[in-house]
């Protein structure tokens, strides 16, 4: 197995708190990791550092053995890193497919995208209708949209930041 991601001495400080203090983490290709801790322990901050949504104050990140500076979520996606945030970023007045298309290259054909959404959702056992408007979806269905959006990029690393925090116990079981 190869090292997919390595963090060395990642530190992120905010005016009133140190969110990450010299964190080291190694993720091998094919591994699954869970980061556990109390509220405010810096878990989400660390995930956002990996995804390029937050810049660390110090430390190094290596991707497939190469040192990288992930300065934005776009740069993370280009490397093959996707993230599902604990809070949705969907537009209620758009359809599932239209929401997902917003993060894709210009010129993406909606009909082809709808088929990819359907295929990906089925592959992972996530019921999803690409033509439904987001305002008609349950919270669980909105979370599925976010997960399928991340999976469509065929990521080498998928970050799930508390993906079940907004779901009912019944939806979590499903």
Identify the function of each model-found stretch.
Residues 1-174:
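Glycine-rich phosphate-binding loops of nucleotide-dependent enzymes
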């Amino acid at each position: 197995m190869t090292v997919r991601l390595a963090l060395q001495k990642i530190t992120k400080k905010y005016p009133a708190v140190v969110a990450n203090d010299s964190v080291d983490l190694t993720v091998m290709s094919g591994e699954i990791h869970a980061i556990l801790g109390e509220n405010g322990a810096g878990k989400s901050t660390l995930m956002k550092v990996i995804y390029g949504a937050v810049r660390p104050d110090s430390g190094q990140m290596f991707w497939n053995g190469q040192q990288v500076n992930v300065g934005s979520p776009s740069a993370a996606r280009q490397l093959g890193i996707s993230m599902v945030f604990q809070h949705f970023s969907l537009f209620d007045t758009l359809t599932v497919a239209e929401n997902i298309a917003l993060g894709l290259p210009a010129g993406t054909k909606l009909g082809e995208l709808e088929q990819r959404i359907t295929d990906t959702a089925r592959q992972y056992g996530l019921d999803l209708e690409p033509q439904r408007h987001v305002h008609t979806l349950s919270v669980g269905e909105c979370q599925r949209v976010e997960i399928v959006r991340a999976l469509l990029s065929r990521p080498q690393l998928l970050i799930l930041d508390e993906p079940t925090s907004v779901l009912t116990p019944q939806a979590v079981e499903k």
